[in-house]
C-alpha cells in the first residue's frame, strides 16, 4: 500500500494520528472556531509547524465524499439524499463484481479441455463411419444432394454419399449405408454386418478393408459415358468417365485390397485404362468365409468368398434381390453382353452399391 523506498519509511499509527490532528485543526480554523483550534493544539501538545491547506480543507472534503457514497448505498438511497454520481458508482460496482455462484472462473472454462470424445456428435446407426481410417475427400464440391447427374457431365461433381445416406431419397433398399435388411448373403459369405465402408470420389479404401482375394478398388466420381470394351472375353463393361475408377485383378501378388493396375489418373488418355474385372476369384476349394461386418478384415472382408460367375454379362447371384434399379453410383452395363456397354448408368463411389436386377436369373453364374 505504501512505498518502501530507501528514503521513505512505512507510515505508522503515530503518523496517521498526526495527520488526523492536523486535518482537525485545519477544519476548525476554516469553520471559524479559532479558540477551539488553539485549545485543541494545546491539549494535544502540538509542537510542530502547521501548514494549512485551501478551504474547506482535506477533512471536510473527504467527509463529504464519504457521506455521499454512504447515502447512495442501495439500502439507504431511498431515505438519504445523494448525488447521481454516487448512485452510478454503486450500480457500476455491483455490475462489475463477480457472481457469487460462478466466482472468479476465467473465460473458456465452461467446456472441458482436450479432444472431443468419440461419439460426441454421433449420428444415426445407419450413418456411422467405418472404424478404419480413411483419407479426406478430394473434392470439396461433392455435397449431399439428389443423384441426378446426366451422362457426360464433368467428373468430380458426383455426390459422395450413396442413396442410403441421402435424406432426399427414401425409396428402395437402404443398401450399403446400414444393415442389409433384404439382401441375403451370397453363397460362401457370412452374415452381413453394419454397412461396408463407402468411399467417395478419388478415394481408395485402406488395404485392410478388403478381404483376401478381393480386387483393389479405386473409386472415382464416375458420371459419364461408358468406356469401350476390349476384345478380351474376360471383362465386364463398366460405365465411367472418371480416370481413377477401376477394379483390378484379385490376389495379384500384392496384399489384399492392393490395386494391381496403375492408377488411370496417371495416364488418363491411354487406351489401356479400361476398367474391367480381369479374373474371377479363386476356386471354391480355396475360398474362406469371411463375415461381412466390421471385423479384423474390415467391412468388406467377406467379399473374397463370392462364387465365380459366368461371363454372360450378368454380375449377380440368386441370393441377391430387392436392390434399387437405375440409381446413380451403380455398376451399370452388367446385364449386357460384353462389348455393348450401356449409357444410362453411372459408376459411383460405392462398389456393389446396387445391381441391375432386370436381366438376371438365380441360375446365372459368372466364370471364365
Curated annotation (Swiss-Prot):
Q: Which domain of life is it from?
A: Eukaryota
Q: Give any Gene Ontology cellular component.
A: nucleus
Question: Where located?
Answer: Nucleus
Keyword hit for Nucleus = yes
Show the GO MF annotations.
single-stranded DNA binding
In the UniProt record, what gene is named as encoding this protein? Answer: SSBP3
Compositionally biased tracts (Polar residues):
265-276, 353-368
Pfam families hit by this protein: SSDP
**Where in the body, by tissue, does this protein show up?**
Expressed in embryonic fibroblasts and chondrocytes.
Q: Where is the composition biased (Gly residues)?
A: 295-305
* Matching InterPro entries: LisH, SSDP_DNA-bd
Assigned keywords, A-Z: DNA-binding, Nucleus, Transcription, Transcription regulation
Q: What is its main location?
A: nucleus
Q: What does this protein do?
A: May be involved in transcription regulation of the alpha 2(I) collagen gene where it binds to the single-stranded polypyrimidine sequences in the promoter region.
Organism equals: Gallus gallus (Chicken)
Biased composition of type Low complexity is found at 174-189, 211-220, 230-248, 326-337
Q: What is this protein called?
A: Single-stranded DNA-binding protein 3
